[in-house]
Amino acid sequence: MAGKTLYDKLWDMHLVKQRDDGSALIYIDRHILHEVTSPQAFEGLRLAGRKPWRIDANIATPDHNVPTTRTERKGGLAAIADEVSRLQVQTLDENCDDFGITEFKMNDVRQGIVHVVGPEQGATLPGMTVVCGDSHTSTHGAFGALAHGIGTSEVEHVLATQCLVAKKMKNMLVKVEGKLPAGVTAKDIVLAVIGRIGTAGGNGHAIEFAGSAIRDLSIEGRMTICNMSIEAGARVGLVAVDQKTIDYVKGRPFAPSAEQWEQAVACWQGLVSDADARFDTVVELDAAQIKPQVSWGTSPEMVLAVDQNVPDPARESDPIKRGSIERALKYMGLQPNQAITDIQLDRVFIGSCTNSRIEDLRAAAEVARGRKVAATIKQALVVPGSGLVKEQAEKEGLDRIFIEAGFEWREPGCSMCLAMNPDRLESGEHCASTSNRNFEGRQGAGGRTHLVSPAMAAAAAVNGRFIDVRELLA
């Protein structure tokens, strides 16, 4: 009998009941809530006369709608200009207060983006099932946890029952071997993977990322990789547990302590795929061949190395692909065969649940140090992923590096990743962004998003156009 994959093990650990229709009932260990997808779920609970089944399994924080300027944040709820956004944040506060759920409110130093806050608080632990009403919950798979996004009706179901109906996925292995070149990061790995398999490549699969290049990554780098499993078409991304995982979790507020810690570690050390485990699909990449990546189009799969040119639709024989390229070029305002390094930028955004952790800010600050944002850049934002990340960055002096270079240093939140708060693009503007999605209008109606790593974003800010960051780090 073949061994089990990590995904198989996590599934079996949480299987409550297998159903005749092929679906199953899965137990959920951790539920993370934010202001956008939770109000209707709590209202459904009240209408049914129910309460959360296991209150301590839930944590919450507002992130999508919160303003990121210091002035607005000091003003509290009243300073949120948009009425719907203000109501959503207020409703989250009221619901958590009413039901006794732990919430890191807007001006709590522990507040931040849900997928930054969960891990940094130790609320995400190896072997857990983790869900949240947000597709990028896959981020938490970096800890060897089975984590994925859910819809609002499922948020209500988890609150009421601590279980979820799900169907088991296929197993995909993405193996990245070798050593990354200097200046190439986890973000470049995952963009290269998506460029290789496409945004539908992982459909119906849980992707496990493995290989020496993945093992060499920090936990923060692994979170970046798992975060963008969604853009590769998968619902789940995973990295096996190792000593780095255990060291990261140890001592965090929600982590086990004393005797329970030793028991937990003994359990976690088995959260790896067996040597003889079988995967339905295997994809292999050579880390040494990966260069800094830049997305050029309106899908994450439309991505190239920084030294390449955007495609010419006339050279594409497939009419569907040709049409897709033509539409993307038109929306993005680019010409066939235009060099990536000739794309003029208007704004730069360093932040989001993909790249707003302390390691990301350090990488960007290394590039920004002693340089100035180009005069042609209208705005360059740095938005830490949480109040604690911001606090640590300020302790290290990173805020001063950014401010002296001409960046804006903001309060934590989702910010310009999505047009649900005051930070957004104007129509026609090009933005170098460390976020995860670049479809039409994602950062604002008519906005044009280019996905890059934090180091590449900082390099673009000081250059005014894309440049291979390795030229600045040499």
UniProtKB/Swiss-Prot annotation:
Q: Tell me which EC number(s) this protein carries.
A: 4.2.1.33
Cofactor(s) demanded: [4Fe-4S] cluster
- UniProt KW Amino-acid biosynthesis keyword: yes
Q: Which residues bind [4Fe-4S] cluster?
A: 353, 414, 417
Q: Which reaction does it catalyse?
A: (2R,3S)-3-isopropylmalate = (2S)-2-isopropylmalate
Q: Name one GO biological process term.
A: L-leucine biosynthetic process
- Using the chain's own numbering, where are the disulfide bonds? none
Does the entry feature the keyword Acetylation, yes or no?
A: no
- Which key words are in the record? 4Fe-4S, Amino-acid biosynthesis, Branched-chain amino acid biosynthesis, Iron, Iron-sulfur, Leucine biosynthesis, Lyase, Metal-binding
Q: Which residues form the signal peptide?
A: none
- Pathway recorded for this protein: Amino-acid biosynthesis; L-leucine biosynthesis; L-leucine from 3-methyl-2-oxobutanoate: step 2/4
Q: What Gene3D superfamilies does this protein map onto?
A: Aconitase, domain 3
Q: Which Pfam families match?
A: Aconitase
GO MF annotation list: 3-isopropylmalate dehydratase activity; 4 iron, 4 sulfur cluster binding; metal ion binding
The record's remark on the cofactor is: Binds 1 [4Fe-4S] cluster per subunit.
Enzyme class of the recorded protein, top EC level: lyase
Kindly give the NCBIfam families that the UniProt entry links to this protein: leuC, PRK05478.1, PRK12466.1
Relate the assembly described in the record: Heterodimer of LeuC and LeuD.
What's this protein's function?
Answer: Catalyzes the isomerization between 2-isopropylmalate and 3-isopropylmalate, via the formation of 2-isopropylmaleate.
Q: Which family does it belong to?
A: Belongs to the aconitase/IPM isomerase family. LeuC type 1 subfamily.
Which protein, by its recorded name, is this?
3-isopropylmalate dehydratase large subunit
Q: Which gene encodes it?
A: leuC
